């Protein structure tokens, strides 16, 4: 059996994240991902190199994006002989792409690879009416011009109504925010705790920018030099003034302030074998040790939509002989402040850990001072497929700065899924 190799995280690059319909309103997925890729090429002197592979993806895609990642490679200064493919696992896309590339490096199939993702809600795909689509296909199948005209004469004004992207789970009809509101009610997560976590995210990220932390993590794009969702002057008073966004009654606790906004952006990470990195004189910030994905039955199983990482982490810990407390940093994606707090509360709940996770004892509490120490999605924003790359690069840099340590990544995703990983130095 092939001896598995350690997978080095060499570094990352992203463009600043932007709130939807802002600076990137006219930027396509391809333009943003290519910009992030070009920045990575420049940072690590990859010009003209044939990379093992590039794996990336987007949650919201136009039909023109059917070969998105490969087109970005062809539009970059990488060798055109670099293979590339698309990945999509909702908000877990970027991290899942990194795990796919890492597995090939570990097995010796490739020496290096690039992984990440991109998303835009500003340039969201708007489809043709389903009735119009079927009529056009029927007309295309018709043999004669007369038959084609007969079909096209069935067109009516309602066929011109466009098909807009839906903000809801197909199986339930509820938005992610509505699902998370139900989770917050189930786990009795107070509004004040959610607002406090949101405030800490903004404060931590503002401090990181002030110290120049992001200088080697991103490259400017379309005039933007930092994430424009960041609010350095945010306060609990400002957060408390916001109205509930998903539940209008007095039960509502999720607001625009403690939930991530719709965001545009792209991110990538460069991975490689130790030998490849050293041969090229590239840094090794940390190592991607292992990953685990999970899914829950949020439709019929009485489980919260965004609780899958709660299930993935204990499997990951057991396989690696670790406990939840064996980490120096915790990077938990802040889709909503309530999701993070539900996750932490579930791991501390003995009955839940026994009946749902099959554990003899609860995983326990974490040291909150180690959680999202440079800020996370509530401050940066959340371009769905791009969040994983941002988190991997940020955590690897944290471990490199510390000189040692171990970090845990947890990312919830639509469809009741979650992707988790361990990074160590």
Kindly give the residue locations of the regions a language model identified.
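Active-site pocket-lining segment
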Residues: 296-379
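Conserved beta-ketoacyl condensing-enzyme motif
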Residues: 25-113, 117-143, 212, 218-228, ...
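Active-site-proximal alpha-helical scaffold in enzymes
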Residues: 89-119, 127, 184-213, 268-275, ...
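Condensing-enzyme catalytic core mediating Claisen C-C bond formation in acyl metabolism
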Residues: 1-27, 151-166, 240-311, 319-320, ...
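Short, well-ordered amphipathic alpha-helical segments that serve as non-catalytic structural scaffolds
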Residues: 29-44, 68-72, 97, 176-183, ...
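Flexible glycine-/small-residue-enriched beta->alpha junction loops
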Residues: 112-182
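Conserved catalytic cysteine-centered active-site region
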Residues: 58-113, 156-158, 171-174, 233-261, ...
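N-terminal extracellular/periplasmic Venus flytrap/periplasmic-binding protein-like
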Residues: 13-15, 25-35, 43, 156, ...
